[in-house]
């Protein structure tokens, strides 16, 4: 047996036929195939994400590994800035404000902010991500802490709130 075969990390479970057949299994990071597809985010993976969701995989399945305590596929897609995957997950009912467990308690918005991914941040806010001025992780750090240039995100949210409140009309029905 070659040393390369022994040293091959368990992360290559996707290429193993038995792992592909059992979509509920996890790799050494605690990730399912849905997590892997969301993290990679390319077109091929988007089709895999759709297939897994069509087969009944929970869109909010959490990863339980040493570095991914409670991360959902949406956390990983936001971290990578994969807008099409994020859109698919949200359409299927992903919790846009899901928090990781452990010390941080990050939302997908925190993940996108840490990566300074402006498109992902804008997409999450426009999709309804919770963005009060005091949104903090468990260390009391707001997304601004991880991305100092995020002030524009609060401005987008403020403009959205203003346009929503100004377009509020009351409907009356006449009998």
Where are these regions (language model features)?
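Ankyrin repeat domain, specifically the short helix-to-loop turn at the C-terminus of the second helix
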Residues: 17-20, 50-58, 87-95, 122-130, ...
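Intrinsically disordered, low-complexity regulatory segments in ankyrin-centric signaling systems
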Residues: 1-55, 64, 161-175
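Leucine-rich solenoid repeat scaffolds
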Residues: 125, 131-160
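Conserved ankyrin/ankyrin-like repeat signature
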Residues: 45-48, 84-85, 119-120, 152-155
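Ankyrin-repeat junction/capping positions
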Residues: 24, 60, 64, 97-99, ...
